[in-house]
């Protein structure tokens, strides 16, 4: 879907300013933060609508609680032999199990569907080979009716996500 309405695309001066003031500094700071041996995995976190939007082929389809992505298939494995994944499949599978255990009975945790990971995960994985996972969080977990953020639900969600990530790290660190 287009970002700008027809006839409202910014001119080259505005585009250059946006790149200089936001895009380049963001990616430089991110690369700098990863320029250490102490970072063992990185997460690119987003929120997703509870249902697919009308512009998608699967419009109205309920979305999972979490979508964990490494550019692979629905098991976290490469789409085809030799294709890029940004996190080892066994790690992504362990992370999915940990999230599913933490949110048992509340909904699905899936890998690479409806999202497979995007520019940030690929670009920054390629720089240092630090594993990257894109995490999509269903807004229904923390939004009340009318799209207002429920602060109590959000605080609980933070704790549970931390618990899921800690459980994952404990499992793969054994």
Question: What are the functions of these language-model segments?
Answer:
Residues 1-174:
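N-terminal catalytic or cofactor-binding beta/alpha core of small enzyme domains
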């Amino acid at each position: 879907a287009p970002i700008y309405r027809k006839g409202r695309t910014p001119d080259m001066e505005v585009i250059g300013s946006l790149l200089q003031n936001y895009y380049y500094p963001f990616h430089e700071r991110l690369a700098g933060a990863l320029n250490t041996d102490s970072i063992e995995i990185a997460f690119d976190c987003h929120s997703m609508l509870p249902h697919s939007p009308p512009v998608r082929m699967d419009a109205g389809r309920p979305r999972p609680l979490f979508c964990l992505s490494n550019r692979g298939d629905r098991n976290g494995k490469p789409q085809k032999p030799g294709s890029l994944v940004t996190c080892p499949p066994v790690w992504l599978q362990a992370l999915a199990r940990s999230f599913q255990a933490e949110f048992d009975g509340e909904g699905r945790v899936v890998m690479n569907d409806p999202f497979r990971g995007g520019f940030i995960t690929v670009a920054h994985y390629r720089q240092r080979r630090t594993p990257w996972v894109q995490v999509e969080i269903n807004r229904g977990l923390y939004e009340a009716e009318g799209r207002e953020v429920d602060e109590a639900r959000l605080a609980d969600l933070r704790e549970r996500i931390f618990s899921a990530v800690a459980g994952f790290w404990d499992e793969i660190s054994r």
